[in-house]
Curated annotation (Swiss-Prot):
Lineage, uppermost ranks: Eukaryota, Metazoa, Ecdysozoa, Nematoda, Chromadorea
Start and end residues of each stretch annotated as Disordered: 621-644
Gene null: resulting phenotype: RNAi-mediated knockdown of the protein causes worms to become extremely lean and transparent. Slower progression through the larval stages, in particular the L1 and L2 stages. Increase in average life span, decreased brood size and loss of fat storage granules in the intestine leading to decreased opacity. Reduced rate of pharyngeal pumping, reduced size of proton pulses inside the cells, increased intracellular acidification, reduced uptake of fatty acids, and doubling of the defecation period.
Subcellular location: Apical cell membrane
Organism the protein comes from: Caenorhabditis elegans
GO cellular component, as recorded: apical plasma membrane; plasma membrane
Residue ranges annotated as Cytoplasmic topological domain: 1-6, 28-51, 73-78, 129-137, 195-201, 266-294, 355-364, 451-644
Compositionally biased spans, kind Acidic residues: 622-636
Membrane topology label: Multi-pass membrane protein
Family stated for the protein in its record: Belongs to the monovalent cation:proton antiporter 1 (CPA1) transporter (TC 2.A.36) family.
Membrane-side (Extracellular) residue stretches: 100-107, 159-173, 223-244, 316-333, 386-401, 423-429
Protein's UniProt name: Na(+)/H(+) exchanger protein 2
Length: 644
């Protein structure tokens, strides 16, 4: 009985029952009734969607239970826990004799259905300013660093294979194919851990961007080496190698191009879908068109990962301006739900597939693969940072370099690629086994130890300080000044690039892609718009705090406002006085009387005068953020005290 009370046992049991029912029912033959039944059990009609729903429910419940167990989430990453659950279920299935094909994750299912929500979520919510400010460094890590890792791992393993140490004889082209799998860094596993660490923005965006684009580069090279293997090494000629190199650039940057094209199309569609009857379709366009972009990338042999990443990053700005805020909020929440569900199912199936895959164990090959992955990952990061630091203002420290090298976790994408290797490759089963061990090593050992190591090395944390209005203004001023200085010096750096992009965006792209009415509202006065946004943010912060601590300041502010109001309103026409009084009342909660009189500043009147804006902000917070006065409530006198 004590065993049944353990949450992880219940999770395994739930997923086991769901999977076993799906596996057994698919083998049952259809029986014809001899009498008319009261009810039917038509499993075959709902087998596929029901199995998907059961897996999603079971895996999601597993994640909830993990978060309820004390200290479990602090010690193990979610990815490691989900893999363990899948591994346990897979072992049980094997012991009871369930057909392994019933719980094997096909590469087509992974690449076409589970992967797109993950990469779209990463691209759509990508911190665009930091990403494009560091785009040159990220591109170097992703393209040069990944290519170096692939070639170095492959050449090292191939050179050792010439000694006859490995049990399967593998040519160089097949080793390059496996190298493209082993060098692939999984953005899902990396991003989750680094978000928990709250590392500084420079380090986070370097790891985030590199892992995101690394997938696209690795997949492009994987397909190139796979095509070379299908042609046959002995049949390759010089033009094939030249075409392969050109194809690498065409596929990678073609994927970016098709992503930008679909971002343009999505923004254009949402611009015209503004009528009440059709604007509900905006959510459909925001979700379906990027997925269509991914499929078009697959259709034309381009990098579908880069396509959907850049589609999400480029369309977000325009879609948010075209679509009403409630629809945007609901759509973005649904994107997060899809991403979380895909991530959960992938890692559970990764554990299951450990048992269901065909394996070939070669200790020497596996150990050397792990060692070479660690060595060349570290070497690539150190060498790239050495050259990049010569041209960077914010340089990568030695601690940053260590965390970047140690944080190169492998995951689901590497597994999806290795199981997609054709059966005619002699070392496929050895590659699958080695890839799974590399994933386990990085997710479990490196993933578990990354947080304590980062704390021990005192990695610089992210600055959680929220900028106020004057800081935003100074930041904009510095950007504009730096762009002007670069222009005067004749140096075209990233400030000049950003300034040129803003000019192109404001003069040409936004008039085409953004609804004119929305653009007029947005462009009335940029300073006023920025000021209003920051005032709203400051008001929310004040509302979340104890109002009593702000009472003295609020009283002085109202006295100053009334004094200025009495001065400003003199000599103004009666119509203007009415408009001005209404404006002050609606926007600032300040009542201006015809005789310029003031309300006695008793605590009750002061509270009523000063909390009009705060109450509206509190209502907004309650509606949107689930905020409930931050643990405070007001009594009849109008003062706040801590809720008991």
């Amino acid at each position: 009985m004590s065993l049944l009370r353990r949450p992880w046992v219940l999770v395994v049991g739930l997923l086991l029952i769901m999977s076993y029912v799906g596996a057994e029912c698919e083998e049952e033959e259809k029986e014809y009734p001899s009498r008319y039944p009261i009810a039917y059990f038509e499993w075959e009609n709902v087998k596929i969607p029901m199995t998907i729903c059961l897996w999603l429910i079971g895996a999601s419940i597993a994640k909830i239970i993990f978060n309820l167990i004390p200290h479990l989430n602090e010690l193990f990453p979610d990815s490691a826990l989900l893999i363990m659950i899948g591994l346990i279920i897979g072992i049980i299935f094997k012991l009871i004799g369930v057909n392994k094909n019933a719980f094997f994750l096909e590469s087509e299912v992974f690449m076409l259905y589970l992967l797109p929500p993950l990469v779209f979520d990463a691209g759509y919510f990508m911190p665009a300013r930091q990403f494009f400010d560091n785009f040159g460094s990220i591109l170097c890590f992703a393209m040069i660093g990944t290519s170096f890792n692939i070639v170095a791992i492959a050449l090292s393993l191939w050179a050792i294979s010439l000694t006859g140490l490995f049990s399967v004889e593998t040519p160089l082209m097949h080793m390059l194919l496996f190298g493209s799998v082993a060098a692939d860094v999984d953005p899902v596993a990396v991003i989750v851990i680094f978000e928990e660490l709250k590392v500084n923005e420079v380090l986070f965006i370097a790891v985030f961007g590199e892992s995101l684009l690394n997938d696209g580069v690795a997949v492009v090279l994987y397909r190139m080496f796979l095509t070379f293997s299908e042609i046959g090494t002995e049949n390759l000629i010089t033009s094939d190698y030249i075409n392969g190199g050109v194809s690498f650039l065409v596929v990678a940057f073609g994927g970016i191009g098709i992503g930008l094209l679909f971002a343009f199309l999505t923004s254009l569609v949402t611009r015209f879908a503004r009528d009440e009857e059709v604007k509900v379709l905006n959510s459909v366009f925001i979700l379906i068109l990027p997925y269509t972009c991914y499929l078009c990338g697959e259709l034309f042999g381009l990098s579908s990962i880069m396509a959907i990443v850049f589609c999400g990053a480029a369309m977000r700005q325009y879609c948010r301006e075209n679509v009403d805020p409630d629809t945007v909020k609901a759509t973005e929440s649904f994107i997060k739900v899809l991403s979380l569900a895909s991530e959960t199912v992938i890692f559970v199936f990764l554990g299951l597939s450990t048992v269901s895959s065909n394996h070939h164990w070669d200790t020497s090959f596996i150990v050397l693969t792990v060692v070479f992955c660690l060595i060349y990952r570290t070497l690539g990061v150190v060498v790239m940072c050495y050259f990049l630091n010569k041209y960077r203002l914010n340089k990568y420290t030695k601690v940053d370099q260590f965390i970047m090298a140690y944080g190169g976790l492998r995951g689901a994408i590497a597994y999806g690629l290795v199981v997609a290797i054709p059966d005619f490759i002699p070392g496929k089963n050895m590659f699958v086994t080695s890839c799974i061990i590399v994933i386990y090593f990085t997710v479990f050992l490196q993933g578990i130890t990354l947080k304590p190591i980062a704390e021990f090395l005192q990695v610089e944390k992210k600055n959680v300080h929220s900028k106020n209005m004057i800081e935003h203004i100074y930041s904009e001023l510095i950007d504009t000044t730096m762009a002007g200085m670069e222009d005067i010096a004749g140096f075209k750096g990233h400030h000049w690039i950003r300034d040129s992009w803003n000019a192109l965006n404001n003069n040409y792209l936004r008039p085409i892609l953004v609804n004119k009415n929305n653009m007029k509202e947005m462009d009335k006065t940029k300073l006023v718009r920025k000021y209003k946004h920051l005032v709203d943010e400051d008001a929310k912060k004040i509302a979340r705090g104890d109002l009593n601590s702000n009472m003295v300041f609020t009283k002085a502010l109202i006295e100053h406002t009334r004094s200025r109001t009495n001065t400003m309103i003199d000599g103004v026409s009666s119509t203007s006085k009415i408009d001005f009084t209404k404006h002050m009342k609606e926007n600032f909660g300040v009542t201006v009387y015809d005789d310029h009189s003031t309300v006695p500043m008793t605590p009750t009147h002061l509270f009523q005068e000063t909390t009009e804006v705060e109450y509206s902000v509190r209502s907004e917070i309650n509606d949107n953020d689930g905020f409930e006065n931050d643990g405070y409530e007001s009594d009849e006198s109008g003062s706040f005290h801590e809720r008991v």
